[in-house]
Amino acid sequence: MKRYPTFIKNSILLFYFFFLLILPVVVLFLLIFQNNWHEVLRKATDPIAVSAYLLTVQMAFYAALVNSIFGFIITWVLTRYQFWGREFLDAAVDLPFALPTSVAGLTLATVYGDQGWIGSLFNLFGFQIVFTKIGVLLAMIFVSFPFVIRTLQPVLQEMEKSLEEAAWSLGASSWETFRKVILPTLWPALFTGFTLSFSRALGEFGSIVMISSNLPFKDLVASVLIYQSLEQYDYLGASVIGAVVLLIALFTLLLINAFQIMKFRV
C-alpha cells in the first residue's frame, strides 16, 4: 500500500512535466514536420536567420561571462562585509526578476540613449550604445544579472571560515587560499549560475526589442526575428527559427553540463 502514494506523486510530477514542457515542444516539431522539408531547410538556413542565431548565442555568452565575473564580486561583498545599505543592495539584486522586460528596455534606452544621462556622455566620444550590439548585450546582462549572485550566495554563506583560517595557519597567502580552498568550492555554483544566466539571456525579447534597432545583420536577435515573422504571418518561419534556437540552447546547455561533469570528476 505504501507504493501507491509514491506512484501517485511520481505520476503527478511526470504529467505536470510532460504537459508543461514536453508537449509544447513535441507539438512545435510536429507542426514543422508537416511542411515540405526543402522549405523548412530554407527557412532555417536563411542568411538573416543564421546571423540572428550567431548574434544571439554570442551576446548571451558574453552576458553570462560578465555576470559571472561581476556577480562573484558582488556576492563576495554582500556575504563577507557589513556596511550601510547592504540589505537594500541585496534586495535590489532581484529587481530584474520583478520588472517587466519591456519596462527594463525602456529604462535602459532612456538612460543609455543618445540623449540619456549616460548615453549622452558616451556620445561625446562617438560611442553609441542604444540601437547597437552593445545595447543587446546590456539588455541581456540586465535581465540575467541575479542568477549568478543567487546561486553563489548560499554557498558562500555556508562556507566555513575555519577552512580559510586553517590555510592561513599553514602559511598560505590570501591568493593561495582563494585559489586552492575557496574557488574549488564555488566552481559548481559558479557554473550553474553561468548556465542559468546564459539560458535567460538566450531567450530575452522584451528589453531587446526596445533597445536595439532590430535590423538584420546588425543587432537582430533570434527572439525578435521570431516576432517579426509572426507579424508577417510567416508561422512556419517563426516555428522553424524557434525550433533551431531551442536545439542550439539544448546543445549548448548539454555541452556546458558535460564540461562541468568532466571538470569536477578530475
UniProtKB/Swiss-Prot annotation:
Pfam families, A to Z: BPD_transp_1
One Gene Ontology cellular component annotation held by this UniProt entry: chloroplast membrane
Protein name in the entry: Probable sulfate transport system permease protein cysT
Record-annotated ABC transmembrane type-1 domain positions: 53-257
Functional note: Part of the ABC transporter complex cysAWTP (TC 3.A.1.6.1) involved in sulfate/thiosulfate import. Probably responsible for the translocation of the substrate across the membrane.
Gene field: cysT
Record-annotated membrane-spanning stretches: 12-32, 59-79, 91-111, 129-149, 181-201, 206-226, 236-256
PANTHER family: SULFATE TRANSPORT SYSTEM PERMEASE PROTEIN, SULFATE TRANSPORT SYSTEM PERMEASE PROTEIN CYST
Record keyword Plastid present: yes
Intracellular or extracellular location(s): Plastid, Chloroplast membrane
Family named by the database record: Belongs to the binding-protein-dependent transport system permease family. CysTW subfamily.
Keyword terms of this UniProt record: Chloroplast, Membrane, Plastid, Sulfate transport, Transmembrane, Transmembrane helix, Transport
GO molecular function list: ABC-type sulfate transporter activity
Membrane-protein topology: Multi-pass membrane protein
